[in-house]
């Protein structure tokens, strides 16, 4: 019932105000993923030897990723925010809204890999490398199906 009321309120808003609101949501969504990417980037650099392995730093980035998995993204995936709705602004494929269960599944694999990484990131470089590789596979797993190659 609450959902229906909310829809009615949204429908009453001027179209431009709503489009702006949705654009803000998309920006926030992309910001979330940028945070994932920023932390992952530091870890990958250590694995590749572009940065020196440091257990405490690796642990910090792994813990940041755990923190990010506790964020509920649901509101950032409001209807009307796919690449089909806002071309040029987002790479989120419309398939996401047709297959929330599939997205959820990819999300769960990602959360699991983050938690595993967090267990080992501070131990040594080999453990970090294995954890990062597994996690990277779960990022790619979702991107392959639900993120467009370009905007
Ligand atoms: C459950 C699905 C899913 C998982 C898991 C996932 N992503 Fe994404 N990611 C997306 C989607 C969808 C977008 C496109 C968002 C948009 O353009 O609105 C995206 C966008 C991005 C972007 C681009 C942000 C920008 O500048 O527009 C980066 C960077 C990124 N993801 C990194 C990661 C990393 C790193 C991981 C794993 C640690 C990860 N993602 C895991 C779905 C996922």
Regions found by a protein language model. Give the residues of each.
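Sec-dependent N-terminal signal peptides
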Residues: 4-13
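Sequence context surrounding c-type heme c attachment/ligation sites in exported
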Residues: 23-151
């Amino acid at each position: 019932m609450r959902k229906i009321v909310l829809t009615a309120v949204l429908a009453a808003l001027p179209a431009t105000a709503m489009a702006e609101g949705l654009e803000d949501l998309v920006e926030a969504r992309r910001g979330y993923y940028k945070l994932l990417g920023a932390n992952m980037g530091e870890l990958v650099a250590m694995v590749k030897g572009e940065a020196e392995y440091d257990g405490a730093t690796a642990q910090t980035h792994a813990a940041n990723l755990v923190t990010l998995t506790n964020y509920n993204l649901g509101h950032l995936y409001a209807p009307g925010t796919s690449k089909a709705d806002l071309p040029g602004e987002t790479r989120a494929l419309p398939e996401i809204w047709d297959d929330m269960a599939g997205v959820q599944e990819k999300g769960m694999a990602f959360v699991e890999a983050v938690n595993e990484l967090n267990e080992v990131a501070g131990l040594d470089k080999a453990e970090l490398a294995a954890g990062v590789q597994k996690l990277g596979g779960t990022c790619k797993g979702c991107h392959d199906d639900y993120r467009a190659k370009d905007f």
